[in-house]
Structure formats: C-alpha cells, structure tokens
From Swiss-Prot:
Chain coiled-coil ranges: none
SUPFAM superfamilies, sorted: Anticodon-binding domain of a subclass of class I aminoacyl-tRNA synthetases, Arginyl-tRNA synthetase (ArgRS), N-terminal 'additional' domain, Nucleotidylyl transferase
Superkingdom of the organism of origin: Bacteria
Gene Ontology terms for molecular function: arginine-tRNA ligase activity; ATP binding
Annotated source species: Escherichia coli O1:K1 / APEC
InterPro entries: aa-tRNA-synth_I_CS (IPR001412), Arg-tRNA-ligase (IPR001278), Arg-tRNA-synth_N (IPR005148), Arg-tRNA-synth_N_sf (IPR036695), ArgRS_core (IPR035684), DALR_anticod-bd (IPR008909), Rossmann-like_a/b/a_fold (IPR014729), tRNAsynth_Ia_anticodon-bd (IPR009080)
Family: Belongs to the class-I aminoacyl-tRNA synthetase family.
UniProt EC number: 6.1.1.19
UniProt name for this protein: Arginine--tRNA ligase
Keyword Aminoacyl-tRNA synthetase: yes
C-alpha cells in the first residue's frame, strides 16, 4: 500500500479540475510534524504562480474537488496554501489488517525490470580491505530491496582480473617454483605480490620476462591462462568467505571481471573510428568530448587505445555498458563505485550514448559514496598507517560484540552467545555504514556503532526482540488473533499505524535513489513510535480483550516490518538478546 502515491493521484486530479495543467505536481509529502497531519500537499505554490492566482485561493478550489472520503478524517489548508491531510483511523485499521494478511506486508510489486547492479569489485591477488566495504554492503542492500520489489536483478561483481600485474605474478611464482598456485592462500599471494613488484622494479631481466608473459597471457597461451585462472580462483574463494561473513548475497556466479570484455575492445575502437567519434592523436586513439573541457577550455580528449595498442579502463567500461544493455538486456544499470570515479564514468557513458550503444531510455546511474574515516577525520587506517583488511575488521567486530554480549548475558550457553555476537558484531559494522547518507564521508567509531541506544544495529535488534517478548508474555493463539479486528482510537495507535503503512513508500525511495539510510531512518523512527505506544497504550493489561488483541496486532505488524526492513539491509535479527 503506497498511501503517498494514492493521495498524489487524488490531489492531482482535484488540481486539474480546479484549472491546473495536466502535468501539475501535487508534491504530496509525509508531514514532518504530527500537527500538520500525516501528509501535506505543497504543490499549490508553483501551480498558482503559473495560473496567476494566490496559492491559498487555488488550495480552496482544489478542496472543492478533492474527494478523500474513507481515506482522510480531516483536510485543512495551512499557511500560504499547504493542504494538510489527516488519515482516517478506520482507513488505517483496514490497511493494517490487510498488511498482516499478506506475506509481503501489503507491499505491491511495480512493473518488473531487469536491473544490473555493479558492486564490490575487489582486485585479484589482493585481500579485500575496508575500501571495499561500502560498495559491497550498500550495493547488496539495493539488490535485496529491488529483488523484494519483484525486479530481476543481475549482480555484477566487476573484479579487477586483468592487467600487466599478472605477467609479473606468474613470473615470480615460477621463479619460486610454486606453480601449484591452487594450494596458496590469499594472504600468501599478497606477500608474493609485494615481492614480485620489488623484483619487477629492481631486476630488468625479470621485468622483461614478466612483460613477455603478459603478451603470452593476452594472446591466449593455455599454460599462462591456466596460471591466471588459479590466481583468480584463490582470490574469489577467499573473498567468498568474506561475503558469507558479511551476510552479502554475492556468489562466484556473479563475477563479471574486466577480462570478460577483452574480446569486445578491438571492435569497439574500430566502430568508434568508423562513426567518426574516435581519431588518431599523437599515436593514440582518442575521443574528444565537448561536454568536458581541459584547462585550456578545449574539448577533453579521452584515450581509448594507447599508441602501444593497449586499452584503458575507459575502453573496458564502454564495452561493459554495451554488454549490459545488449547481452543482459538491462532496463537500468546501477554502479556502486566511489565518488572519485565520477568523471571517469561520465566520460565513458558520454561515449556510450554518442555511439548509440545504450539508449537514453536505459538509465546508467552512478550511486557514488564517500569515504570511511577514522576518528581523526582522515582515511581509516591501521595504527601503523597501513590499509585495514576487511577480514581483520570483522574479526575485531566479532571480538568486541562477544565481550558486549557476554557482559549482558553471563549465563548464556557458548554456542548461543557466539551466534548472537556474530549477528550483533557484523550487524553493527554494516548498519553504521548503511545508516549514513552514502554520498557523504563518515566516521568509523566502534563505541557508537556497538551502543544499545541511538540509530545502531544493536538498538534495532533489541527493539525487535522487545516486540517479540510481548507475544511470548501474551501466550496468544495466532489463529484467534488473525480473526480479531484492529481498532484505532488513541493518537499513539494512529501514529504507529500510519508509520507502519509507510513501509512501501520507504522501499520505493530506496529502490529509486539507492539510499539505504532512508530505510534505517524509517526503522529507527518506527522503533521509537512503538516504544511510545507500548508505554502509553497498555497491551497485556488493556481494558478489554478487544483492545488487547488490536494492540497485539499493531505490535505484530511492527515486528514483521522491523524484521523485513532489516532483512532488506542484510542485517540479521535474533529472537532474544
């Protein structure tokens, strides 16, 4: 049930009847304060100006055409021409019943689309570090939300599995007589990488051999391809352990590395030349873009093939977008890549559009994100100033959560404590990130993220268990409760019911904008409203069974909504804490 969409259409029709153009925007929003009702239509200002009317006068005319019978108990004009809408308690009660009767809590499915989501994208032969966290978990929350809404989602893990470094690695593995790379661990591989790089920089003979190996690898020599595949396998096997720990839905089947697009690159360069988009410049092949200017104010040149014949990331990204449209049949493509790559992507996509590889009707969206910072406001590092490995971060989260949970539950059996610590620790790291607007940098702070108060995973997980405990105490028969009516008489009942029915609106925003923090804010607000409702509207000691059962149903929908909302974020819930 999307009440905002329902009201928007009703107000829009009333505005048209009052003389507004057919494309008018009613601008129906959730009200910020309870005294302004549940929703507010703010579109009179802009439309009245076009019609040469006072906004309040237009609002008065709109009200004469606005039929919200059975939806709103009161509609009033406020200020210069805002229309405040107060939902009818009977309408709220009816839709709470409907939500409880549905596995999807009454959430409708929009028209199904094929949506490609590009996220995580670690590099082969390197361990995942904290820089991969945001893309991985924000992208996964978007994927979960889109799948819940019924879309066909194709996860694309664009791993860095190609480049000159592989010649260097294979040469070094050979030198160490460790061709059986399959028995190596990724941590070993990182050490090998460092040693190989050192030799590459210091030993010209070794560097020459590495360069020859790259040529052989790129020409398809089976021995070198096999060595390369082993390196990829080691990396992705280790990364899968991290994905599973993070409760992220990525699997090996979702890997679509840079190498996938290699066969397309010569054809793309030739095609861009044939279309007159790419030209020779100082030996390289370049596309000049009017939309981007260099320091001299001239069109910026984007190199797609170097003079030695090598291709660039831009060439791969052009091929990648083309593949996602032509082969995967994407209706929409989302890229969860950090904000520093924005200009690079915009340039690649400008070429994609000019070449006609992806039509304008298929959005290519850069859902960029900021950096994870330490308490000092600088990029998050180890004490020694090195990059923090993601596995080490998760180990520390688990250890801190274990201490926290043991302190609060000294008698809990060890296996139960471990399960709870895992849910709290991993949940805390993920939620701390997801609850921040992805476009901004954020401060990583263990104390804040593991707190049991505020907008944190432990607080949300505890709020869920608190609602469940009401049911345990009630010892209620589920079938008997299902048949009971919902009655809304108290203000706090109405406020909780109205917020519960805004779940679909919240999902819609997350799906459209790729902003999981909106879901976090909604769930946190919902938990707070339930707390106030529980305090002021007795459930188990209600004045009669009818009121008790009705309030239990509000509690039941709260628990279901919290669980489902946290699930779309990839945050695990527990029955007891």
């Amino acid at each position: 049930m999307n009440i905002q969409a329902l009201l928007s259409e009703k107000v829009r029709q009333a505005m048209i009847a009052a003389g507004a153009p057919a494309d008018c925007e009613p601008q129906v929003r959730q009200s910020a304060k309870v005294q302004f009702g549940n929703y507010q239509a703010n579109g009179m200002m802009a439309v009245a100006k076009k019609l040469g009317m006072a906004p309040r006068q237009l609002a008065e005319q709109v009200l004469t055409h606005l039929d919200l019978n059975g939806i709103a108990s009161k509609v009033e004009i406020a200020g210069p021409g805002f229309i405040n809408i107060f939902l009818d308690p009977a309408f709220l009660a009816e839709h709470v019943q409907q939500a409880l009767a549905s596995d999807r809590l009454g959430v409708a499915m929009p028209e199904k689309q094929t949506i490609v989501v590009d996220y995580s994208a670690p590099n082969v032969a390197k361990e995942m570090h904290v820089g991969h966290l945001r893309s991985t978990i924000i992208g996964d929350a978007a994927v979960r939300t889109l799948e819940f809404l019924g879309h066909k989602v194709i996860r694309a893990n664009h791993v860095g599995d190609w480049g000159t470094q592989f010649g260097m690695l294979i040469a070094w593995l050979e030198k160490q007589q460790q061709e059986n790379a399959g028995e190596m661990e990724l941590a070993d591989l990182e050490g090998f990488y460092r040693d190989a790089k050192k030799h590459y920089d210091e030993d010209e003979e070794f560097a020459e051999r590495a360069r020859n190996y790259v040529v052989k690898l790129q020409s398809g020599d089976e021995y070198f391809r096999e060595m390369w595949r082993k390196l990829v396998d080691i990396t992705m096997t280790q990364n899968q352990i991290t994905y599973d720990r993070l409760n992220v839905t990525l699997t090996r089947d979702d890997v679509m590395g840079e190498s996938l697009y290699n066969p397309m690159l010569p054809g793309i360069v030739a095609d861009l030349k044939a279309k007159g988009l790419a030209v020779e410049s100082e030996g390289a092949t370049v596309v000049f873009l009017d939309e981007f200017k260099n320091k001299e104010g001239e069109p910026m040149g984007v190199i797609i093939q170097k003079k030695d014949g090598g291709y660039l990331y831009t060439t791969t990204d052009i091929a990648c977008a083309k593949y996602r449209y032509e082969t995967l049949h994407a209706d929409r493509v989302l890229y969860y890549i950090d904000s520093r790559q924005h200009q690079h992507l915009m340039q690649a996509w400008a070429i994609v559009r000019k070449a006609g590889y992806v039509p304008e009707s298929v959005p290519l969206e850069h859902h960029m994100f900021g950096m994870m910072l330490g308490k000092d406001g600088k990029p998050f590092k180890t004490r020694a100033g090195g990059t923090v490995k993601l596995a080490d971060l998760l180990d520390e989260a688990l250890e801190r959560a274990r201490r926290l949970v043991a302190e609060k539950n000294p008698d809990m059996p060890a296996d139960e404590l471990e399960k709870l610590a895992n849910a709290v620790g991993i949940g805390a790291v993920k939620y701390a990130d997801l609850s921040k607007n992805r476009t901004t940098d954020y401060i990583f702070d263990w104390d804040n993220m593991l707190a049991f108060e505020g907008n944190t995973a432990p607080y949300m997980q505890y709020a869920y268990t608190r609602v469940l405990s009401v049911f345990r105490k009630a010892e209620i028969d589920e079938e008997q409760l299902a048949a009971a009516p919902v009655i809304i008489r108290e203000d706090r009942e109405a406020q909780l019911a109205a917020r519960l029915l805004q779940f679909e609106e919240t999902l819609t925003v997350v799906a459209r904008e790729g902003t999981p923090h909106v879901m976090c804010a909604y769930l946190y607000d919902l938990a707070g409203l339930f707390s106030g409702f529980y305090e002021h509207c007795p459930i188990l000691s209600a004045e009669n069974e009818e009121v008790r059962n009705s309030r239990l149903k509000l509690a039941q929908l709260t628990a279901k909504t919290l669980k489902l909302g946290l699930d779309t974020l990839g945050i695990e819930t527990v029955e007891r804490m």
